[in-house]
């Protein structure tokens, strides 16, 4: 049986609603308020009733009222409700309270019966809940049974692995044929291939991660970049600049600037340059012959234009008969006359053999 707790809680809890003592105090206060209202109205009603009785009955009624008052005084003294100095009006109130207490007691009995029923219902619910929890604790929920795992034999696994190496994906007829040969179902073969493909994928990922973490990074590529400009000045001249080709031959190998520039001054450098040019021209052999005449010009007072005109060689092709004018490769001597490049001992003139290739026209 539940004991009422003296601690007051929120008015919305179940304990406050089902607490019998608080309900009784509440009903008692409510009844006292109603009785006080009746007590305030009772003296007036009693006075009017007594006035009518006194007017109607006369002296006999007065004697009866006196007997009633004496009876009330003796009843009050016997019960001991108050002091001996209380007025008769208070005893009237007690009598009226006793008269009115009948229906109120019935209401209290109904309320108490309802509260007892609610308490019994609550106890029964709690007991049922405790029984359920105990039953649940004793009897655990049955787990959903998993399908038994398919165990493949070594021969089946070997055959599946061999077929997987040959073909990672199987069509429906191929799957059916393989399953029938291995005494398996088509679904089992399909699931095995799916798991095997996923396993291969995971292995590749793990391997790539291991290589990425443990292996050193590859060295950076080095590309040769030619320096074209340094401090605002070109580093490679156009004549000496070489261009890459698939055969490894630069463009400078076919340069036509192999002959130095020639001047018309009276210096030893000009003579040395002329000798070098003659030696280079003699190195080439061809079908063209150049005859340089030995005609001399005037004295020291001759002009350069006259000497140039006198020193124009007459070159004739041995076979064709066409004439080609080639620039003079000789210099001018100190005497002012044109000096031949090559002089023979008998004829006084020499013909050099050369080709047009490698000789730059003047």
Swiss-Prot record:
Listed Basic and acidic residues bias regions: 132-141
Pfam families: Homeodomain
DNA-binding region: 145-204
Source taxon at top rank: Eukaryota
UniProt cross-references to InterPro entries, sorted A to Z: HD, HD_metazoa, Homeobox_CS, Homeobox_NK-like, Homeodomain-like_sf
Subcellular location(s) of the protein: Nucleus
Xref: CDD domains: homeodomain (cd00086)
Region annotation Disordered: where it falls in the sequence: 126-149, 203-222
A biological-process GO annotation: post-embryonic digestive tract morphogenesis
Gene Ontology cellular component list: nucleus
Tissues where this protein is expressed: Expressed in spleen and intestine. Also expressed in salivary gland and tongue.
Gene Ontology MF terms: DNA-binding transcription factor activity, RNA polymerase II-specific; sequence-specific double-stranded DNA binding
Keywords, alphabetical: Developmental protein, DNA-binding, Homeobox, Nucleus, Transcription, Transcription regulation
Physiological role: Transcriptional regulator essential for normal development and functions of the small intestine and spleen. Activates directly MADCAM1 expression. Required for homing of lymphocytes in spleen and mucosa-associated lymphoid tissue. May have a role during pharyngeal organogenesis.
PANTHER family per UniProt: HOMEOBOX PROTEIN NKX (PTHR24340), HOMEOBOX PROTEIN NKX-2.3 (PTHR24340:SF32)
Similarity comment: Belongs to the NK-2 homeobox family.
Protein's name according to its UniProt entry: Homeobox protein Nkx-2.3
Species name: Mus musculus (Mouse)
Organismal lineage: Eukaryota, Metazoa, Chordata, Craniata, Vertebrata
